[in-house]
Amino acid sequence: MQRDSGSSEVAVRRATADDAQAIGAVFDAAVRAGWTYLGELAQKPMFAPEDWDQLVADHGPPKVLLVATGRAGQVVGYTAAHPDDGELFLLFVHPAYAGQGIGRALLGAAHDALRAAGCRQAYLYTHEQNERALAVYESAGYRRDGSVRESEFGGTTIRELRIVKQL
């Protein structure tokens, strides 16, 4: 499926096994550039290459794992969702492509997939200090519902806000 991402056209499609390492590279670059609130933890790879292979293997249908590709076919972003409960749990765009509407294109495609699976609501958790992501989600119609999730990662407490959108 082609989606207009604002300044350029981006293709959004289901991820394949061949995309696994590119998905990992997008994640690492996005985290290094955007998760400054995690300090040193964000500056080193968080997952091994085989973890990305497993992510793709675990997210075949009916689960949703979509990639956005640029003009040359390179993976520039991705998102993952669980249609059983409407959770959108990953959305990353390579920082070199930030601000071009790729995140919006991925969100739209994920919403379409969730709707097709019968979901009436989408939700996600994002770090309370991830202001850029919160702004993108809120401009797409997500609203904070007051729920908070805390977890530990690398000795750091991660506090995430839940936001929801009616589909």
Which positions does each model-derived feature cover?
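Short, well-ordered coil/turn elements that cap or connect secondary structure elements
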Residues: 7, 60-61, 139
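C-terminal "cap" of GNAT-fold acetyltransferases
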Residues: 120-134, 138-167
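Active-site acidic-Proline motif in GNAT/NAT acetyltransferases
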Residues: 94-100, 128-129
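Extreme N-terminal starter segment of soluble prokaryotic enzymes
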Residues: 9-11
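Acetyl-CoA-dependent GNAT
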Residues: 2-3, 14-20, 24-96, 104-109, ...
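Short polybasic/polar patches that bind polyanions
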Residues: 98, 115, 138
